[in-house]
Amino acid sequence: MRDTDPAPESDRLGDHPHPRETAILLGQSDAEQSLLDAFMSGRMHHAWLLTGPKGIGKATLAYRMARFVLRHGSPEVAAAAGATNLQTPMDHPVFRQVAAGSHPNILSLRRPWDEKAKRFKTVLTVDEVRRTTGFFGMSAGAGGWRIGIIDAADDMNVNSENALLKILEEPPPQSLFFVVAHQPGRLLPTIRSRCRTLRMTPLAAEDVAAVLDASNNVKANEADRLAMARLSEGSVGRALAINDGGGLDLYRDIVALLMELPRLNIKNLHKLADKIARRGADDAWTTGIDLLGDWLQRLVRTGAGAPHQPEFVNGEAASMVRLAQSASLDRWVEVWEKISQLVARAEALNTDRKIVVLNIFSMLESVAGSHAGQHQSA
């Protein structure tokens, strides 16, 4: 990174377009209509809490609404223009300004880049949130609105949340806040009470696949795009991360090892661990660990009697049933929780990632073999 390069953005996924640059939003027509109706009523609430799983379009909707408000300014102007959705043409000056991050009436808050440490700060700091004081204290330019977008509120600490609460409690005229939250239950209840909650839902696999199809950064064939869409569980952001991290190949390798439990092919395990844990392969690490966690979650659901999920590898469903029956549901829940704690600790302490992967599979091997061991001792 050169000194002249812009600072990285924590709310941008890899080389993919930032939500403010994204013109199309699929699968969220109900949420879009709710915002449109609120604005056209002339009684637009000043703060909106956009909730739902990560990567489903919450920030994209926030920027889409911000462009609409800044373009039209009032319900009367929007009605006169015949607006029936929140779309702003890409060649419109407002779209271009917002996409460039240069519109004076939008303030975007995210985890800041630490130039000295050359990494993102771990929290959305109180100093970042306090920027709202000066921003909303200035008179707005064209359109009369000032809009703050927080992506994501999950990154705030208590001090940041209290700073946000102050501005939410005394909102200036013609101010709008869009607060993106993946797990809103973790926010201060007083913040939630000041906002109108808009719950957004995961997308259909076909919608996720359509976004992948339209992306210039996704080179996968149609079958693989659909597989990534299904693995993403309705999250475009997740599907793009799977693509970037070589997720389909990783998933096949992971499942091949899991299907052999309680026996492990040590050679293949080390090959997988090297692939996930190699230096500089952050995408592969994040994607591989996430996919393994998802597989274990589906295993627990299977053990609890949930309907079988579609399989992505031949024989996967039968192996999942077999493993679910190889130990009690409590044991699988316990190991799932322990693995989550192990990964979190490894991230915090910068532990050798290969050792983490080997330990994870050792734990799984132990649980999968426990039932057989009990029979032998009996």
Question: Can you annotate each of these PLM segments?
Answer:
Residues 152-156, 168, 184:
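Conserved Walker B
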Residues 51, 150-151:
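Residues at the beta-strand->loop junction immediately N-terminal to the Walker
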Residues 142-147, 172-178:
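Loop/turn-to-beta-strand initiation segments
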Residues 1-68, 72-80, 84-87, 93-97, ...:
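Charged, glycine-rich active-site and insertion segments that engage polyanionic ligands
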Residues 126, 158-159, 189:
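Conserved D-loop-proximal element of ABC-family nucleotide-binding domains
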Residues 137, 162-176:
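Conserved catalytic/switch belt of AAA+ P-loop NTPases
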Residues 34-39, 92, 123-147, 155, ...:
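Conserved alpha-helical scaffold flanking the Walker A/P-loop in AAA+ ATPase domains
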Residues 116-126, 153, 197:
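Flexible beta-alpha connector loops of hexameric P-loop NTPases
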